[in-house]
Curated annotation (Swiss-Prot):
Any one GO molecular-function label of the UniProt entry: lipid binding
Family to which this protein belongs: Belongs to the ATPase C chain family.
Name of a matching Pfam family: ATP-synt_C
Designated name of the protein: ATP synthase subunit c
Alphabetical GO biological process terms: proton motive force-driven ATP synthesis
């Protein structure tokens, strides 16, 4: 049962991060296409947003380890 809980935690964390990263990058590309002169600022904000979204799978892995070994 612990193995299933760990797999679900990691899977949902990765799924959410993948969807979030896709949305962030697609909106950034749309913004750069509309205003190419704002590309540098948009790219910086994109990487900050991706870093925040990628924190969730890391937390999911920690929760999975706690569920598996705890």
């Amino acid at each position: 049962m612990n193995l299933i809980a760990a797999a679900i935690a990691i899977g949902l964390g990765a799924l959410g991060a993948g969807i979030g990263n896709g949305l962030i990058v697609s909106r950034t590309v749309e913004g750069i296409a509309r205003q190419p002169e704002a590309g540098k600022e948009l790219r910086t904000l994109m990487f900050m947003g991706i870093a925040l979204v990628e924190a969730l799978p890391i937390i999911a892995v920690v929760i999975a380890f706690l569920a598996f070994f705890g």
